[in-house]
Structures are given as structure tokens and as C-alpha cells.
Amino acid sequence: MVETGDSILDLQAIFGNANPVYIEIGSGKGEFISTYPRFHPEWNFLGFEVRGKRIRNCLKKLSPAVNSNVRLVERAVNASISQYIAPESIAGAFIQHPDPWPKKKHHRRRLIQQDLLNSLAGILVPDATIQVSTDHQEYANWIVEEFLTSPHFISIYEEVMQEEPNLDNHVVTWFEREQARMGYPPNYMLFRKI
């Protein structure tokens, strides 16, 4: 576990090396953060999750011998991320099935908002990518609009929403599996910092 405060995290000290650092925002039940980094031992991964129970589930799935390039942070990600992550220090980000907050009165709680995108643009290296997936069609439309109206990002794909994952070694998360089982196929999006 990585403790965050008001000071900038020393990522090299946290991981013990200077390898590129990727973040997962909302590690959920831990499928992605415990599996995908195994395919990329040359990268470091910092998983953020706000719920203590989910952090404990993630920790159960992580093995120090296998997941030596993974660290977890129990903290909500919002625009304040730029207060504890150094500018242009993150190689990329993964956001898997964030809470869609479907009721209109709750839309202000949605993760993907301009203030977060502005902060992410500040901490990402040039040309870094953000991979996003959601099974909620209206939220997918919202995400696309937020990214495409941001001055910091463009879609990698001409057709912004894809039906197939845009990652080698795609990890199917519990949320993706459950929603697909109920007839809600995921949309995959990939954006690049400009």
C-alpha cells in the first residue's frame, strides 16, 4: 500500500526502479491490476481504489513474487491527483467500467469530467494513452463527449467506440463479465494525450 498525502509521490522510491508507471483508476475487485502487469514486467502499475473492501480483495489477488511491479493506493481519484503525482510522470492510464451514475441528478459524481481530464493531462507524459471501457451506453456517449471536447486528448480510433478491446492480453473484469452476461456489451475507447 502506498500512502498519499499532500506531497508529491516519489515513484522511483516506491517501485525501486525508474520503469514507466501506469495507473489504473478504480481497481475494483483486482482482476486487471493483478493480471495485466504480469504481461509487462518492464512497467510499474499503481492501482487506485477508494473502497477499503475492494482494496482488501485486490491485496488477496496480489502476490509479491508475481506482482512486484504493482502498488495500491486507497484513495479516490479526482482533480487533486495532480497534487500528489508529479507532472508528466505517468506513462498511461486504464479506467475499467467506472460507476455510470445513471440518474441525471448524480451525473456530477461521474469520474470522467473536464477537471479530472485536465489533471490527468498534467501528470501524463506526451503521447500517453488512456484506455476506457464501459457497458453503459449513455455513459459511453458522455465519456466520448468529455474527451473530445477536452483540448488535451484525441481518440486513437476514427470510430471512437470499439466493440473489441484495444489491449493485447485483455483482462475481463468481474464488472465486464457480469454486465455482458446481462446483455450489456462493453464499449472500449482509447485516447491519446496531445
Regions found by a protein language model. Give the residues of each.
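S-adenosyl-L-methionine
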Residues: 1-21, 31-38, 59-87
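Class I SAM-dependent methyltransferase "Motif I" SAM/SAH-binding loop
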Residues: 26-28
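Conserved SAM/SAH-binding beta-strand->alpha-helix loop
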Residues: 51
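Short alpha-helix adjacent to the SAM-binding motif of class I
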Residues: 56-61, 142
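A short glycine-rich, Lys/Arg-flanked "PGG" loop and its adjoining helix->strand segment in the class I
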Residues: 112-126
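Conserved beta-strand signature within the Rossmann-like core of class I S-adenosyl-L-methionine
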Residues: 126-134
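Class I S-adenosyl-L-methionine
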Residues: 145, 150-194
